[in-house]
Every structure is written in C-alpha cells, then in structure tokens.
Design a protein with these regions (language model features):
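Short, low-complexity disordered leader/linker segments with a strong preference
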Residues: 1-44
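Extracytoplasmic
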Residues: 43, 55, 73, 83-86, ...
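An extracytoplasmic/periplasmic, membrane-proximal ligand-sensing/linker region
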Residues: 43, 187, 194, 200-202, ...
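Bilobed "Venus flytrap"/periplasmic-binding protein-like clamshell domains
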Residues: 43-76, 133-201, 295, 310, ...
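Pocket-flanking alpha-helical
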Residues: 60-66, 77-119, 193-198, 213-222
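A ligand-binding cleft/hinge motif common to bilobed small-molecule-binding domains
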Residues: 100-117, 171, 175-178, 206-247
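A structural signal for short loop-to-beta-strand junctions that line the ligand-binding cleft
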Residues: 118-131, 136, 254-264
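A bilobed periplasmic-binding-protein/Venus flytrap-type ligand-binding module shared by bacterial periplasmic
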Residues: 132-146, 265-281
Length: 336
C-alpha cells in the first residue's frame, strides 16, 4: 500500500503542468539521426488522463505513468479527472496523450452520439489496447430495503461524477428498469470515494460506480459498513438493443466486497486510447513496455493481471491505431 500511494503521489505532482494544451511535440515523431536508429523518447511528456479518487483508473494510470517514465525515460504523469467522458474531450482538445475510457463512451465520442452529440464536437481517437472489464457497482446499505434497481425510485442516488462513464452508463441502467434519472430518483453526482463516504454517512441511499475489481472505495466501505450489491442482469439486453452491443453480464464474485453471493452486473470493456495523430513509434514502445511490465503493473492494481496480448485486441468498438495493429500483428495475435 505504501508503494501504491507513493507512485500515485509522484505521478500526480506533475499532472497539473500537463493540463495546458499539449504541444505537437508530444504526439509527432522525433527526427531520427538515421533510418536504422532506434527511437529515442527521452524527455517527451505524456499526460495520461484517468479517473477520480477511489476508482481503478487513477491507480492503474499512476502505475502506468511510473512504468513508462522509468522504462522509456519519458516524463509521464497521471491526471485525475471525472473519467471517461471528460477524458475523451481532453483527447479531442489536445490536452491529453493517453486516456482510459469505457468502450460505450469511446463509441459515442467518435460518432458524435450521446454526450458528444452536436453542438459537441466529435473526437478523433484510436484504441491501442483493451485493458480490462468494468463492473457496474450499485451499492446500498444492507437492510435498507433496496434490493433491486426498481427500489431506487424516489431515493437519493449518486449516479457518478459529472463527465464520467459511470454517469452515462448509470443513466442507461436506470432507464432499462423504467426509471428516469432526472425524475424518478434524487440524483447526485459524486465520484467513487465521495459516493462511498456519502452512503456511509447517510447522505445518499445508494450509489453507482462503474469500475474494475476491486474498487478501493467500495472495499473500504465494506470494511466498515454492511453493504448490498444490486443485480442488473435484466438491464443488459435492453441496453444493447438501444445503444449498441457494448454490454455483457459480468459477475462480481462472492467475497469481493464481503458479499455472500455472486452479483451479476452490466459489464463493459475499458480501452486505452490516443489521438489518431499520435506517433506510431511511441505507440509501439508504450505497448511493448506495458506488456513487458505487466507483473509490475499488477502490483499496483490487480486488474493489470487481465492485460493480455490475446485479449487486448478484442472488444473495442472504435478502430485501433495503425501502429497498434502492426504491434499486435508482430506478436501473432491480430485476428481482425
């Protein structure tokens, strides 16, 4: 735990400097001394946009920034954000180099749908890896009488931070159960940690958070408060029918958060994306470093154990960066 927080602190210290618009130097290829010279990325800056406190993105992103800084000699930092929706906007606006994002949010961003419908501008971005799966956590206090999504009607519910993928997906889950987030609940928009704190303190009745396993805010809450995780199995087909085939049944295993049974949630893939113009040589170097350092990343967060060559190309609804395709072809895993 001490190593984890030291990594996060070190990478976040320089993140503020990366919030200004990125220069083209960060995404265009450096001049080579000769055609045979190996790319040298020393001194290049990389701003990795992640998520909020208590979630997986910020932890994983901080670990990735640490690894890339050490192995590629770049100046990589992890910037805390509301998460997916804002991350795609930061890519679009030239303020980020790599972004963690949900697959459904990425699709909307590229195609000008949902939160990216006009007058919002589309995002020109490409996937470089499918990282791991997200699980929609819907959390209430045990014994509260909230046992189904329908029971949230009229309740105080945090549906995720404004600008997060949790917010978008949470609204869709509610909709699948016939609930309008603007009318049928008392919505609040808090990040994972603030949501967990608010539930513990009786300020909300339930909260949504879409994250990997384990999500630290939920783990910490479960250690002090008896919680109930809400099943969403009936939502998945309805969400896919309306929004696209992004969602799948994802089980939170028994015991993850002291839960007595497996809980079926609406799952979605997490992507690592870059601007379409991103330097191809650097894409390949980042991917090689990520896979070479998978064991180190897994020490930062267990979800990094799911970073695998044979699954990193599966489940992205947006195109892969050409250099990423070349990388995966060189490893014999590109099947598309």
């Amino acid at each position: 735990m001490r190593r984890l927080w030291s990594v996060i602190a070190a990478t976040l210290l320089v993140a503020v400097a990366c919030q200004a618009p990125r220069s083209t130097a960060s995404t265009t290829a450096p001049a080579a001394a000769s055609s045979s010279a190996a790319p040298n990325f020393a001194g290049r800056t990389l701003n990795i946009v992640t998520g909020g406190t208590g979630g997986v993105y910020i932890i994983y992103g901080a670990g990735l920034a640490d690894v890339l800084s050490k192995k590629l000699k770049v100046a990589a930092s992890a910037q805390s954000t509301p998460a997916s929706v804002d991350n795609m906007k930061l890519i679009r606006d030239g303020k980020a180099d790599l972004a963690f994002t949900l697959a459904d949010t990425a699709f909307d961003a590229i195609n000008g749908k949902g939160r990216f419908a006009p007058p919002e501008a589309k995002v020109d971005a490409k996937t470089i890896a499918v990282m791991y799966s997200n699980y929609m956590h819907i959390v209430a206090k045990a014994g509260s009488g909230i046992n189904t999504v329908a029971d949230l009607k009229g309740k105080r519910v945090s549906i995720g931070a404004a600008g997060s993928g949790t917010e978008t997906k949470g609204i869709r889950v509610l909709e699948a159960y016939g609930l309008d987030a603007t009318k049928d609940i008392q919505p609040q928009r808090l990040n994972a940690q603030d949501s967990a704190d608010a539930l513990r303190d009786g300020k909300v009745d339930a909260f949504f958070f879409d994250g990997g396993l384990p999500t630290s805010a939920v783990s910490d809450l479960a250690n002090s408060t008896a919680i109930k995780l809400i099943d969403q199995s009936d939502a998945i087909a309805k969400m896919n029918a309306k929004y696209g085939n992004f969602y799948f049944a994802a089980k939170i295993p028994k015991g993850t958060y002291k839960n007595d049974v497996d809980v079926v949630t609406a799952g979605v893939a997490n992507l690592l994306v870059v601007p379409s113009s991103f330097d191809g040589a650097l894409v390949k170097a980042i991917l090689q470093t990520m896979f070479d350092s998978q064991a180190d990343l897994a020490l930062i967060h267990p979800e990094a154990k799911n970073l695998k060559l044979d699954t990193a190309t599966q489940g992205s609804p947006i195109d892969f960066h050409p250099a990423a395709i070349e990388f995966y072809k060189s490893k014999g895993v590109w099947k598309q």
